[in-house]
Amino acid sequence: MKKYLQQLYEGIFTNNPVLVQLIGMCPTLATTTSLNNGIGMGLAATAVLICSNAVISLLRKFIPSKVRIAAYITIIAGFVTAVDLLLQAYLPSLSKSLGLFIPLIVVNCIILARAEAFASKNKVLPSIVDGLAMGLGFTFALCILSSIREILGNGTIAGVSLFGENYEPMIMMILPAGGFLTLGCVIALFQKNLKKGE
């Protein structure tokens, strides 16, 4: 149990896919304009990570090494399709807001990296925990970034107005330049605090 808790801690903090490993930048920058988008993208990726890690771990001895990447992408694509269809059916506004970035989870570096580096070499339960840990780390990073960008760029959080009618939002924060600026500042602060804790 302690091993799994350590895995969770590492996935969220010391080995965070976005804030430490710097992978998955495309959806990170594109979908963090609002907290709802950040949560939606993070949870969708987490579900795909958990399921794909489990299946890849189960099939690791049967997948020939020469076609392993193609096999991983096929497995991941199946779960992404399921998540996309569920979002379209039950959360159509979120699905529309995230647009093309849900199908692009198929080639997300985080998911492919965990399939190759962890799930293909470990048993099912540790692979599921790894998927959960990395997914929560991804969601955590997206929530921080999207909260900052939405508050400064719109004056809202999860669509709820914070400052009233007179607030002049910093429109740049919801544009790509604001995404890069916020990401750089958050990474710097996060890594500085990690080094203090060591």
Identify the role of each PLM range.
Residues Q6, I128-E198:
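C-terminal transmembrane helix-loop-helix hairpin of multi-pass membrane proteins
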Residues Q7-E10, T14, S57-K61, P126-M134:
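Short amphipathic alpha-helical coupling elements at transmembrane boundaries
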Residues I12-T31, G42-L43, T182:
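The first (N-terminal) embedded transmembrane alpha-helix
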Residues M25-L29, A45-I50, A77-D84, V106-L112, ...:
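Hydrophobic core segments of alpha-helical transmembrane domains in multi-pass membrane transport
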Residues L35-C51, A71, S95-V106:
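Structural signature of hydrophobic alpha-helical transmembrane segments
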Residues S52-S65, L112-N122, L189-K196:
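C-terminal ends of transmembrane helices
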Residues I63-I76, S97-P103, S127-D130:
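Cytoplasmic-side transmembrane-helix entry/capping segments in multi-pass membrane proteins
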Residues A82-S97:
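Transmembrane alpha-helix boundary signature
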